Each structure stands twice: as structure tokens, then as C-alpha cells.
């Protein structure tokens, strides 16, 4: 979310985790706002993720890499439970052609001294082999793979519409998307464990 009110609303609705993205703000403002939201979350038994360094978009907004010293200050001052970083990852990347800068990630891990688990937004673009390596050997605890799953959903929905051109019942149209999405998520988890596809 983009502010304390969104975080409060999510907490009031029963969410168990909130994410605040102040990465486009000056460092001091990002720290202050993220710290405030983390306090609200923690006071309600909810975890909070923050972001430092701006993760750009494939074919769009450019990224701003996470500075290790800033990451250390952010982790220490905000009290977040997880911290999203920008190390070559991009949102909306189709296909696994991306490449995480492992040296930059290692520098952040050293600077933060293991104070906070790290998160990779734009994880759909990270090759499976690299995701597995990072999950096993770095403080990365979460990869966001929304693009990967949305592509699967889109393919399944288009097939459902083609198979049922006169159907109008949304449940009948959307039901065939569930199994492919579940299998896509399971495939990612199997690959993380090194079980194969």
C-alpha cells in the first residue's frame, strides 16, 4: 500500500500482513512512514513488509538499486519483518530472462547483518535455478510471482472462453482456471525444492 490509512483498513479487515512501499520517497521519509506503519501493524499482531530501492517495470519505469548502507539503516530503524530490495528484479517481466545481481544482494545481506529477511518483487522474471539458489543460500524469504501466475490465469481463461463460447455463467467460465493456477504454484514450489517440473 501507499499509506497508513490503507494499512489500517487492511488490518481492520483481518489481513495478517501488510506491505508499505515508500521506495519512491527520500530515505528519511520512507523510514519514518514505514516505521509508523510497522508499529501500527505490530500493535495489532500483524507483520509488515517495507521496500527500499525502487523495483521498476519491464518496458516501463526504471529501477533504482538498493544501496546496502541505506538498507542497513532502513532495517534497523523501521523494524519491518521483511524488506523488499531492488537488485536487478523487474515487475511484469514475462519469461525468466532476468538476472538478480547476486553481488549486490550479498552486499545488502552483509550490511543488514541478518536483521531482516529479504524479498524479491518481480520474481517471475528470475530464472528457476537462480530462485532456488537464492532461497537456499541468501536471506531471501519470498519471491513475488504475480506475473507468472497471471499469465497462467490468462491462458486458462482464454481457453475456457474458447471452449465455452456461449457460456455466460462466471463460475462456469472461471472454474477451469483454478487447476492450472494451483499446478503453476506447485511447480514453482517443486522447483524451489529442486524436485524438477
Where are these regions (language model features)?
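C-terminal alpha-helical cap/extension of soluble enzyme domains
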Residues: 128-197
